[in-house]
């Protein structure tokens, strides 16, 4: 994916673009603080694209229309509910999300920073702390960007400004993070395919050996 991104023609613009890409879980950005976030971020010279989770669009069309109506007169805000293209994802200068996995795809591919809103985390294993290892999706947040609490939306303009002023620093930091924690970078498909083929061949050979005895 990185290779494909690096080959893409990059659009040059004097206007910094911000992508807001929430997750689909309880108390996500859309359901908790999106209106306040947009109210604080608009009017600062950015192009802001809100790309809700597809499930939000499917199950809460009234909420999507409410957002479109509320910000209809704000030329710097787009509520995007057409997912036929992912160009807005990779063209954005930074992303704002909560716990969505899209942050990995975005940051690891583009080496661009992410601002995380610390909405309640979706916990699949309520006893995860007994393992004694902090999940990567918690501690990596400040490694590839910055974090704010939902009740700190008044700080959005200053934090976004600081992040965008230090994109080169984040680029280097994220690239180092990816090379340290992502294995088989750039050739994982080949490694995965080789593993599957070798596993199948071993099974076949084991079966033949058992039958020949």
Language-model features, listed with the residues they occupy:
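Conserved catalytic-core segment of nucleotide-activated headgroup transferases in glycan assembly
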Residues: 1-67, 150-153, 164, 184, ...
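Catalytic binding pocket for nucleotide-activated donors in carbohydrate/polymer assembly enzymes
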Residues: 101-180
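Hydrophobic/aromatic beta-strand patches that form the interior of the parallel beta-sheet core
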Residues: 49, 78, 94-96, 115, ...
């Amino acid at each position: 994916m990185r290779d494909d991104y690096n080959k893409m023609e990059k659009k040059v613009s004097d206007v910094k673009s911000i992508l807001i890409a929430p997750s689909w879980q309880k108390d996500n950005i859309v359901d908790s603080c999106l209106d306040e976030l947009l109210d604080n971020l608009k009017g600062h010279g950015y192009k802001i694209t809100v790309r809700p989770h597809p499930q939000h669009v499917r199950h809460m069309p009234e909420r999507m229309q409410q957002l479109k109506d509320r910000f209809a007169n704000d030329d710097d805000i787009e509520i995007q509910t057409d997912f036929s293209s992912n160009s807005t994802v990779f063209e954005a200068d930074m992303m704002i999300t909560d716990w969505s996995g899209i942050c990995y795809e975005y940051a690891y591919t583009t080496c661009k920073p992410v601002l995380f809103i610390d909405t309640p985390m979706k916990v699949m294993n309520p006893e995860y702390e007994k393992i004694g290892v902090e999940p990567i999706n918690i501690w990596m947040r400040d490694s590839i960007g910055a974090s704010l609490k939902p009740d700190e939306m008044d700080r959005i303009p200053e934090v976004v400004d600081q992040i965008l002023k230090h994109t080169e620093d984040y680029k280097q930091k994220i690239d180092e993070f990816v090379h340290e924690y992502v294995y088989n970078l750039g050739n994982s498909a080949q490694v995965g395919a080789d593993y599957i083929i070798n596993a199948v061949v071993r099974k076949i050979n084991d079966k033949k050996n058992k039958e020949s005895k």
